[in-house]
Amino acid sequence: MSSPAEYYNSLPPISKAYGTLCFFATVLCQLQILNPPFLALYYPFVFKKFQIWRLFTSFFFLGKFSINFGIRLLMIARYGVQLEKGAFEKRTADFLWMMIFGAISLLALSAIPFLDIYFLGVPMVSMLLYVWSREYPNSQISMYGLVQLRSFYLPWAMLGLDVIFGSEILPGLLGILVGHTYYFLSVLHPLATGKNYLKTPMWVHKIVARFRIGVQANAPVRPAAANTGSGAFRGRSYRLSQ
């Protein structure tokens, strides 16, 4: 069995970096070194006081130490990592672009006055979970050892649990919306029309190459052996050349 350090070092770069930042953001807030409102997305402070960091730090706070925090962090460690190692294997730039697209979309949605979302970590994790559920739609998931369901339904099941445990439904719902938008534009629409409007920009490839982050190889990705099925429950069988 590998040690915790070996496991951590084996994680893919983007998921590892995001999970680490989320963990330390909560630790620093728990130790009262940082105040959560200091990390929150509040557009009047962004534009009037030039507190630009809020556009970034709002994605790293998953809440104070709690069961919900632990669940979200485990989602990054399990589903984000599996997504980056599997469907996005050797395509680090594409995975990073998915995260950037998700962040920009969530920032735009949170600017709508009646939404009022100040922390975007939960929506981002929900987006990752949704994309994972579309890439691996037929995996069997056990929820707390009580219920077995197809992974295709997992984002909606987690949304239901948020309601049961008294959490807000809107952050998770927006994450699902952004995840579906990404999957439609990057996978479903190109497969149907041959046109990819969400192709990873060259500057993202250059960033990955410049800092030697992960692997850049746009080879087609074969579906996982467990992903057999038909219709709406079938993951993509290939991705058009990026």
Curated annotation (Swiss-Prot):
GO terms for molecular function: signal recognition particle binding. One of its GO terms (cellular component) is endoplasmic reticulum membrane. It is a multi-pass membrane protein. The chain crosses the membrane at residues 21-41, 56-76, 95-115, 158-178. Seedling shoots and roots. InterPro entries: DER1 (IPR007599), Rhomboid-like_sf (IPR035952). It is found in: Endoplasmic reticulum membrane. May be involved in the degradation process of specific misfolded endoplasmic reticulum (ER) luminal proteins. PANTHER family: DER1-LIKE PROTEIN, DERLIN. This is Derlin-1. It comes from Oryza sativa subsp. japonica (Rice). The gene is DER1.
